[in-house]
Amino acid sequence: MKMLNRSAISVKLRQPFVDWINSVSDSGEEEVTLDEVNQESTSYLVPELEEEEDLENLIEDRYLDILENELFSWEEDDSLWPEDMDRALFDEFIRIEPAFMVFDLDDQAPLLAQVLEEVEDFDAED
């Protein structure tokens, strides 16, 4: 087991986000609930956080990246996204749960990082 020099945040969606999901879904699809969307949540590794102020600063710096990623995971057409992509919308749509200490339980496989844009570029070549 290795302690990572990172913290993590988990994204939990709030009811207004779920309402938005249901508003952009095809009319024939069954609506999703808050409990359903939060059964699995996105986790982000972030620089080490030592106190709540660090978390707030991180969110202030990266809220738009997180918000766009979460919206994209439900709807790829960004013309259907909310117009005002600001911190107020982030706070209305998303709740963050921090994990200040992160451990890697896999003793064998090294962590592999690949920039998302590189993956998208590779997929575009196929």
Task: Describe each model-derived feature in a short phrase.
Residues 122-126:
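Charged phosphate-binding loop/patch that engages nucleotide di/tri-phosphates or the phosphate backbone
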Residues 1-79:
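Short helix/strand-capping turn motifs
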Residues 48-119:
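Amphipathic protein-protein interaction modules
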